[in-house]
Amino acid sequence: MSRVFSRLHPQLAESLEEKGWQPTPVQEHVLPDVMAGHDRLIIAPTGSGKTMAGILPLFHRCLTESWPSMSILYITPLRALNRDVDRRLTELAEAVGLRVDVRHGDTSQSQRAKQTRNPPNLLVTTPETFQLMFSGKNLRAMLSSVKAVVVDEVHDLAASERGWQLGVGL
């Protein structure tokens, strides 16, 4: 097992080893800092492991620090990216007893109600849906337990109206 993965929560490290995953250079560089609770802006090429570089240490902290449900918010600019991130993270999350779910404009009312009753550990959403979450009392209460936020493709949001709206929400 790699040195950096061996520092992760035992369940997480074991799951990664079972899957045969090896850390990318980006992950080797970023994981120790984020595991220690430092904020980081991760800029690297597509396919370099940025998503897992940001998520693995947060899953580690979620497990080691017993974070409550709805402790990680993952914001992406596109619904299609939401679904991709949800698919990629769900398998790993389930292997260590965590839950991931997605919420955006296409999420059914029944699924939204389920998320409100039983929030996931990590919620993947869009900036617009994140803003709408402030309008409901139960949803605002859910947001109060958020300990970490990941904004994917921040460069696509930064120079637009969506970016400043997201900034206000955060």
Label every model-predicted segment:
Residues 13-15, 19-170:
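Conserved P-loop/Walker A NTP-binding site and adjacent catalytic elements of P-loop NTPases
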Residues 1-14:
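Conserved ASCE P-loop NTPase core motifs with emphasis on AAA+ ATPases
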